[in-house]
Amino acid sequence: MKIPEGPCRVCHSVKGTRRHFGITACMSCSSFFRRSLNCKFYCPANNSCTILDDQKQFCRSCRYNKCVQSGMRRDCVRKQSYRRQAGRKEAKSPAVSCSNKLSESYEELLNFYVKEANESIARKRQSPLKNAHQVKTSKELLEISKSEDKTSLDAVLHCYGTYILDDEDITTLIRYFKFMNTWIDSAFVYSKSTSNEELLDGNDICKFAYQIDTSIGLSLKNLNLNIFEYAALRAICIWNLKFYETSPKMKSLALEHYKGITGALRQYYENYMSDMDIAVRIGEITMQITTISDLFHDLITLHQKYQIPF
């Protein structure tokens, strides 16, 4: 039996706590700490604010100080570097900040998702067991879903802006990341090969794999996306699946990510495409949201049928 981790040492929440950066903490506080390392905050109340999970708003300065005082270690935060693709031309536009919620430039935001996509795709190619299209039984469905739990959690904790979200929103975002990591990334890799019609004769799990292959898999094959375009598609879908009800803060952050990602795509394209061609290409990418949203709904239905948590 798993031993409960106890309440968050920062805000005292008991929801979804685990070890983060050296202490027991909730996902919301750990994400806030990760994104606040290089930020400077000001407290109008002389750093005397109370930090409790039932508060609607936190003083960022006091929350960060509480993280440090509670034992969160800066040296435990994973260092990430975001490099430009070798040989890529400089964008004509200067670096632009995404919004007042996201201090990162368009390019930094897209590079985060490129790194996540590359790592997920590499896992699929290194191990056939990571390819969701090979799943045929309820046991395999459970195993492949659980295999992406940690990577999806890590992605959310390192994702820009998520420190403002409540635990419920973070849990929702983890599910969206896991769906993309497990099924859509498999479709991206699998779409390079021929369709496996034998899946049609199998159970509902096999039929779902075939459904993905012949819908979004076929679209990805026809679009012939490079890694920058595919990473942008992943990011746009993650923030726009809208299956679960989310807070106004998450809706607002989703809009900022959408603006940032589409802005990054425009900068990426502007060296070799006209404004009209850019609009058409971005439209082709964003049109996939509906298909992927429908597939997520069908996956949740599949998990419910086999009584497998997702």
Curated annotation (Swiss-Prot):
DNA-binding region as annotated in the record: 5-79
Pfam families cross-referenced by the UniProt entry: zf-C4 (PF00105)
Domain NR LBD residue range list: 101-310
GO MF entries: DNA-binding transcription factor activity; sequence-specific DNA binding; zinc ion binding
InterPro entries per record: NHR-like_dom_sf, Nucl_hrmn_rcpt_lig-bd, Znf_hrmn_rcpt, Znf_NHR/GATA
Alphabetized SUPFAM superfamilies for the sequence: Glucocorticoid receptor-like (DNA-binding domain), Nuclear receptor ligand-binding domain
Record's keyword annotation contains DNA-binding: yes
GO cellular component: nucleus
Zinc finger (NR C4-type): 8-29, 43-67
Keywords: DNA-binding, Metal-binding, Nucleus, Receptor, Transcription, Transcription regulation, Zinc, Zinc-finger
Localization per record: Nucleus
Function: Orphan nuclear receptor.
Assigned protein family: Belongs to the nuclear hormone receptor family.
Protein name: Nuclear hormone receptor family member nhr-89
Organism: Caenorhabditis elegans
Gene: nhr-89
